[in-house]
Amino acid sequence: MKVEAKKKFGQNFISDQNLINKIVSILGNDKDQLIIEIGPGTGALTKLLAQKYNKVVAIEIDTDMEPILKKEITNDNFELFLSDVLLVDFEKLIKEKRQHENQKVSIISNMPYYITSEILFRTLNVSDKLTKAVFMMQKEVAIRVCSYKGENNYNNLSVACEFYADKKYEFTVPKHMFYPVPKVDSAIISLTFNNKYTEQIKDKDKFLTFLRKIFNNRRKTILNNLSNVTNDKTKANEILDNLNIDKSLRPEVVGLEDFIRIYNKTR
């Protein structure tokens, strides 16, 4: 069913069934999952999700989509939540909708470009409750998210996602696969959450703030950026000397494990 997309909500719809199957397959074959879909639109992904998994909760800001979704998806295991996703308390939602405490929870979204970072960070904030996230986003941002140290697009978002999850660039989605056709290609990424690094940091929000500040000026050295974090160049010097980290390095060539070591020394 074709509907008019609303630019203010960043709507770009997909309808190709092969693409839909390929995206949903990334969530795996474990039927006993609570799937939270952000921005279901006309329900292209939602319909298959409701067939494949035990519980699907879709969050949609556009109230005009309600009659379309309710007509297209009549499964008892589907629930529509009309809200701006940035106002949703994910922790509360998961607690209320999870059918039992051992049920896996995953998030999937064809993300509006204009709130990609906000959705990503809100997802990371509840990563301890999640098994996986599958996101479609602007290709340029997907490359950034999935970059590692030494790569051109590596930034604080790359490090933050690596901190919480095993990240994977799944595949590119050409712009002609959408209607209306956007200006750029998209890509699918997956985040498989783990606690490999998270237990090394007590206050994760402060660590994410630290990463933003460290990458605030990419042209500056790790010493200069750390000095701005600590407001004390002498202390920054001491931290890097103590950890035997080259002070002339720029943030984009410093890895996650070293950022964790540096951060813990600032506490």
From Swiss-Prot:
Report the principal subcellular site. Answer: cytoplasm
Read off the SUPFAM superfamilies from this record.
S-adenosyl-L-methionine-dependent methyltransferases
Binding positions (S-adenosyl-L-methionine): N12, I14, G39, E60, D84, N110
Alphabetically list the UniProt keywords: Cytoplasm, Methyltransferase, RNA-binding, rRNA processing, S-adenosyl-L-methionine, Transferase
Going by the record, the broad EC class of this enzyme is: transferase
Q: Where in the cell? A: Cytoplasm
List the catalysed reactions.
adenosine(1518)/adenosine(1519) in 16S rRNA + 4 S-adenosyl-L-methionine = N(6)-dimethyladenosine(1518)/N(6)-dimethyladenosine(1519) in 16S rRNA + 4 S-adenosyl-L-homocysteine + 4 H(+)
CDD domains cross-referenced by the UniProt entry: AdoMet_MTases
Q: Which SMART domains does the record associate with it?
A: rADc (SM00650)
Q: Which GO terms describe its cellular component?
A: cytosol
Q: What is its EC number?
A: 2.1.1.182
Q: Which Pfam families match?
A: RrnaAD
* The organism's place on the tree of life at top rank: Bacteria
Which Cys-Cys disulphide bridges does the record give?
none
Record carries keyword Secreted: no
**In Gene Ontology terms, what is one molecular function of this protein?**
16S rRNA (adenine(1518)-N(6)/adenine(1519)-N(6))-dimethyltransferase activity
Is RNA-binding tagged as a keyword? Answer: yes
Which family does the record assign? Belongs to the class I-like SAM-binding methyltransferase superfamily. rRNA adenine N(6)-methyltransferase family. RsmA subfamily.
Q: Extract the HAMAP family matched here.
A: 16SrRNA_methyltr_A
**Protein's job:** Specifically dimethylates two adjacent adenosines (A1518 and A1519) in the loop of a conserved hairpin near the 3'-end of 16S rRNA in the 30S particle. May play a critical role in biogenesis of 30S subunits.
Full protein name? Ribosomal RNA small subunit methyltransferase A
Q: Which organism is it from?
A: Mesoplasma florum (strain ATCC 33453 / NBRC 100688 / NCTC 11704 / L1) (Acholeplasma florum)
- Which lineage? Bacteria, Bacillati, Mycoplasmatota, Mollicutes, Entomoplasmatales
